[in-house]
Curated annotation (Swiss-Prot):
Gene Ontology cellular-component annotations: photosystem I; plasma membrane-derived thylakoid membrane
Protein name: Photosystem I P700 chlorophyll a apoprotein A1
UniProt xrefs under NCBIfam families: psaA
Gene assigned in the entry: psaA
Superkingdom of origin organism: Bacteria
GO biological process: photosynthesis
Location of the region described as Disordered in the Swiss-Prot/TrEMBL record: 1-22
Provenance organism: Prochlorococcus marinus (strain MIT 9301)
HAMAP family listed in its UniProt record: PSI_PsaA (MF_00458)
């Protein structure tokens, strides 16, 4: 890809003196109206049906539009604003449904008995069956997004506030759309502005993250926490009194702007009304009533304390603002990313790379795919961490006792994390093919890793086989012993124990640290509630339901965790092989010249199919799907069995055999979705069937070759010609790569929607 050279006279200018180019691409509607306008070939219009597939494949592949890195970067930057606009429209729709069609007020008044609903189905051909009685005189579809719980945490107390948010989000969407057009067509940043890494880090860390977190802390402190205190007191049956008036219902509560009145807020949090004098005199203890470190869960709501959440965002915002200023920008002080990387040398014994990290700064700064790969890997990992925190540290009021929401958010964040991590492998592969120049990376760490790729992949392959045979072998052994009537010879907590001693040790050191200074790192003892209850803590019950409880680990957990390890390692093996062998291999030394995606190395070279970096991503998606299916099945059964008390604690003895998973999890828990007809959850029965069909439909694309279909099309076209209705656009069978793309998409969508229906019908069906 070419890099646009600086314009004449600009080389000596500082980036921030003239960061944009005015009117680089005037809007040309005649051009934009033409599908495929970026390509001379596609813009001529379709001659065969392959045209529509190429249009989809290349529409967002900005690299191939012009080959100019600056132009591609501007398109990415502009597209970010478009993405934000879509997000704001989506948020607006959620707020609007909450304002007009939901039972938010009814749920807010009685969150332990009323179920959240935000949509009512019209009676056209009997769909009113789907409207369940959710309580508080409301019939509608039960939702499990956690959005009501989040709104309560924000401090939203009525539908008028939701409507204001809906309007505000639409306005923000319009602003974002305008910004996207403006920063591409009217004032587009120059390449030097995008490459000013230290300034970018400064603004992103201190500005977006730091000030964003600080602003949110302000909302939590002034609106969220006081509202939560009033609502919690109502729910606990001991309402607060403000100005001599008992706040017994939501209707009695002060308006949000009134909470900023020191006279009113001082009756909820005296420290909040004490003014800024305490801040500047460093008497910060005066603020300890609304900036707390209580730990544990609020016993009324089963969620983190809002005052703890406020404290967290304040502290994080301050840290990010300080951290964002450690890079060298205008004043010649601070860190230079290039200097840091260039000075990092490889270990001379373990990892001898004479040139260390030299060249990495330029590669990361110039390759958008390399940046995206790193960001996707990190964001995917963060998403998986979020999924675990949703049950271990429930952030929103009453969310912990809404079991379908807990399971739904866990599943959602696991899928998102998995897709992002596979995306990281995809864009790392593209970076290697399109952006990596071997001549610039001689004897640095990237070069050394590529030279050691055979050792890395063969060892990783050995690890995968070891984990796969041993972990699956434990299950096969147990199934065999149970079939032969020899329970004493099974791996279980009551026979041959395989206790997860390291995981149990981690749990115990967390619990034993309470009352000591072991983990806190200070002389002050760790308070009793500073740790999640899942670490050998105590049970918290809200409204007669378990919100959180200790999660015991045993032989069954060790066995399934080794299945997780096996599947994660295989997914990584496929992705890593796709990256390390993206440019060349012993089989195809000139792979880089074939590009990121190609079906085979041309006719006449057998055995060279499915070797492109794209094909590795294709295969990794299946392993990612299987891996996460087992993860979410494990979580669902474990929580129902050992925490929520829904299956009588059968996980430890039933999940140690393959038959147990099939009989006591899949079959037993599918009873709700299979018998859902005639009930409000009947749409999940239909979805279960339909999603199975979509999944099965994928096999048609994955198992058959294009020749079969082209042969069929030829005879169908012949029949059309006979009838004088032949199409002007010539039918073409999908290419090998297109068929795989359509196949894996239907496989994933069908599988995910099947699981969606299975989980929802199960927990909604149990009530």
């Amino acid at each position: 890809m070419t890099i646009s050279p600086p314009e004449s006279g600009e080389k000596n200018k500082k980036v921030l003196e003239d960061p944009v180019k005015a009117d680089p691409r005037p809007i040309d509607f005649a051009k934009l109206d033409k599908p495929g306008f970026w390509s001379t070939k596609l813009s001529k219009g379709p001659k065969t049906t392959t045209w529509i597939w190429n249009l989809h494949a290349d529409a967002h592949d900005f690299d191939v539009h012009t080959g100019d890195a600056e132009e591609a970067t501007r398109k990415i930057f502009s597209a970010h604003f478009g993405h934000l606009a879509v997000i704001f429209i989506w948020m607006s729709a959620a707020f609007f449904h909450g304002a007009r069609f939901s039972n938010y007020s009814g749920w807010l008044a009685d969150p332990t008995h009323v179920k959240p609903g935000a949509q009512q189905v019209w009676a056209i051909v009997g769909q009113e069956m789907l409207n369940a009685d959710l309580g508080a005189n409301y019939n509608g579809i039960q939702i499990s997004s956690g959005i009501f719980h989040m709104w309560r945490a924000w401090g939203i107390t009525n539908e008028s506030e939701l409507m204001a948010l809906a309007i505000g989000a639409v306005v923000m969407a319009a602003l974002m759309l305008h910004a996207g057009i403006f920063h591409y067509h009217k004032a587009a940043p120059k390449m030097e502005w995008f490459q000013d890494i230290e300034s970018m880090l400064n603004h992103h860390i201190a500005g977006l993250v730091g000030l964003g977190s600080l602003a949110w802390a302000g909302h939590c402190i002034h609106i969220g926490a006081p509202t939560a205190a009033l609502l919690d007191a109502i729910d606990a049956g001991s309402p607060l009194v403000i100005n001599g008036k008992e706040i017994a219902t939501i209707a009695d509560m002060p308006m949000p702007h009134q909470l900023c009145d020191p006279q009113i807020i001082g009756q909820i949090f005296p420290g909040l009304a004490s003014g800024t004098g305490n801040f500047f005199s460093l008497n910060w203890l005066a603020f300890s009533d609304f900036l707390t470190f209580k730990g544990g869960l609020n016993p009324v709501t089963g969620s983190l304390w809002m005052t703890d959440v406020s404290h967290h965002h304040l502290a994080f915002g301050v840290i990010a603002i300080i951290g964002g200023h450690m890079y060298r920008t205008n004043y010649g002080i601070g860190h230079s990313m290039k200097e840091i990387l260039d000075s990092q040398q490889g270990d001379p014994i373990l990892f001898p790379a004479p040139k260390g990290h030299q060249g990495l700064f330029e590669f990361m700064a110039e390759s958008r795919h390399a940046q995206l790969a790193v960001n996707l890997a990190m964001l995917g990992s963060i998403s998986i961490l979020v999924s675990h925190h949703m049950y271990a540290m429930p952030p929103y009021p009453y969310i912990a006792t809404d079991y379908m929401t807990v399971l739904g958010l866990f599943t959602h964040h696991m899928w998102i994390g998995g897709l992002f991590i596979v995306g990281a492998g995809a864009h790392a592969g593209i970076a290697m093919v399109r952006d990596y120049d071997p001549a610039k990376h001689i004897d640095n760490v990237l070069d050394r890793i590529l030279k050691a790729r055979d050792a890395l992949i063969s060892h990783l392959n050995w690890v995968c086989m070891w984990l796969g045979f041993h972990s699956f072998g434990l299950y096969i052994h147990n199934d065999t012993m149970r079939a032969l009537g020899r329970p004493q010879d099974m791996f279980s907590d009551s026979a041959i124990q395989l206790q997860p001693i390291f995981a149990q040790w981690v749990q115990s050191i967390q619990a034993s640290a309470v009352g000591t200074s072991l983990l806190a790192g200070t002389a002050e003892a760790l308070p009793h509630k500073a740790l999640s209850e899942v670490f050998n803590g105590s049970l918290v019950e809200v409204g007669g339901k378990v919100a959180i409880a200790p999660i015991p680990l045993g032989t069954a957990d060790l066995m399934i965790h080794h299945i997780h390890a096996f599947q994660i390692h295989v997914t990584v093996l496929i992705l890593l092989k796709g990256v390390l062998y993206a440019r060349s291999s012993r089989l195809i030394p000139d792979k880089a010249s074939l590009g990121f995606r190609f079906p085979c190395d041309g006719p006449g070279r057998g055995g060279t199919c499915q070797v492109s970096s794209w094909d590795h991503v294709f295969l990794a998606l299946f392993w990612m799907y299987n891996c996460l299916s087992i993860v979410i099945f494990h979580f669902s059964w474990k929580m129902q069995s050992d925490v929520w008390g829904l299956t009588g604690g059968n996980f430890a003895q039933s999940s140690i055999t393959i038959n147990g998973w099939l009989r006591d999890f899949l079959w037993a828990q599918a009873s709700q979705v299979l018998t859902s007809y005639g009930q409000s959850i009947s749409m999940y029965g239909l979805m279960f069937l339909g999603a199975h069909f979509i999944w099965a439909f994928s096999l048609m694309f994955l198992f058959s070759g294009r020749g079969y279909w082209q042969e069929l099309f030829e005879s169908i076209v012949w029949a059309h010609n006979k009838l004088k209705v032949a199409p002007t656009i010539q039918p073409r069978a999908l290419s090998i790569t297109q068929g795989r793309a359509v196949g894996v998409t239907h496989f994933l969508v069908g599988g995910i929607a099947t699981t969606w229906a299975f989980f929802h019908a199960r927990l909604f069906g149990l009530g």
